[in-house]
Amino acid sequence: MFCPIGCDPRGRYALNLAGRPPFGKWVPRDKSCHIRRSQPSPSRGFALACAQQKETLMRAILERLLSFDTVSSKPNIALMGYLQDLLAEAGIDSTLIPDPSGGKANLYATVGPQGVPGVMLSGHTDVVPVEGQAWTVSPFALTEKDARYYGRGAADMKGFAACAIEAMVLAAKRPLKVPLHLALSYDEEIGCMGVRSLIDMLEAAPIRPRMCIVGEPTAMQVATGHKGKIALRATCVGREGHSALAPLALNALHLAADFVGVVRGLQARVAATGLRDGDYDVPYSTLHVGKLNGGVQVNIVPNSAVIDFEIRSLAGEDTEALIADLRAGAEAIVAPLRAEFPETEIRIERLWDYPGLGTPSDAGVVNFVKSLTGANGTIKVAFGTEGGLFDARLGIPTVICGPGSMAQGHKPDEFVSVEQIERCRAMLAELVDRCVAGF
């Protein structure tokens, strides 16, 4: 179905054709930090067109969301402009929080009474790359077959976003006593980076949401926790030389290999004697080396090597102690070498992090969302979410509950089943009813 809501948000942005950067990008007309939208662009009628064609609004929204290539390295502002227009058509005011480039933004919207804490539906709009994957369908288009919706982000997590936006539009027609909030972010896939400016905005607000449902894929089970993550880098400095005289140089890749051994040794210790939580697939904190770069060609002894690694920690894990152990291990490697190679070092730096989530299983938000879904128990998930930031920085009680499985995320031919989407729509319809009743 063709959507009359276009991809360029001209009501809020102007295309920069001036002789200065950012060239050819949409930039805010007023250059303000937050861009509000409460009136639709002229000649818009998307929701009405969907109703007339007997197509669910959710499916039409999902089709458009999947059509936007919002890989984290690319802008998402066209997608956000589309959503602002769609929400405005339903009479819903929304706010964009752009990044410094103007190419990416978070979106925040509220339906219902002002000045009352409500329920926040949270998701991200960015997706992981498709390069190098053997897709049999177009990744940036909706393909429906075998009772599944295919496309990059269908499971993680544009399927939930489409359901949440539909719920907001339908809720706008109802007399809510408790408001419904929508929070959509960028750059979640590269460290939950984008949502932090949205959290800054909420932190300064007089009233914060009462609770939050992060719609990451859990097969509609209610998840109360995930591990925290710290991304780190170790830069190994040796001394360059000709490979014919290799013993007279100091190979930085050898230093890196020794440091990887330190990481693996610490992982073995944590697995054997560290904290445990049997609710996770991997019941202990983990250390993982994901990337190693070094060397130019085979006949040059490299003087530099870089290791990117991570710690995924259980709640209560002393991660600073783990990092101290890593630094001590690095020092033990280089200390004996400094007399001959005083420049040698293994420098460890923290790149970014996000906190874990550990909502008590008897918390009000847990019981409330279980009552919406009919779930009896709870789970914890292996992947990270923005939920830990909402909890840690804003004190918002948070759970994770959304359609699909992360087993389908980040893979070629990513999909979410129609059955999972319908269960999510039913949960959100019940949520809207509860907001009308005041819970």
What spans do the regions from the language model cover?
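Leucine-biased recognition of intrinsically disordered, low-complexity hydrophobic segments
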Residues: 2, 15-17, 48
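Short terminal hydrophobic/aromatic SLiMs and anchors at protein ends
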Residues: 12, 17, 23, 31-34, ...
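Short, Lys/Arg-enriched N-terminal segments with co-localized hydrophobic residues
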Residues: 36-37, 44-57
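Metal-dependent amide/peptide-bond hydrolase catalytic core
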Residues: 51, 100, 233-439
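Acidic/His- and Gly-rich active-site-bordering loop/insert found
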Residues: 51-152, 173-176, 395, 405
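Fold-level recognition of mixed alpha/beta catalytic cores in primary-metabolism enzymes, strongest
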Residues: 146-149, 155, 159-265, 410-423
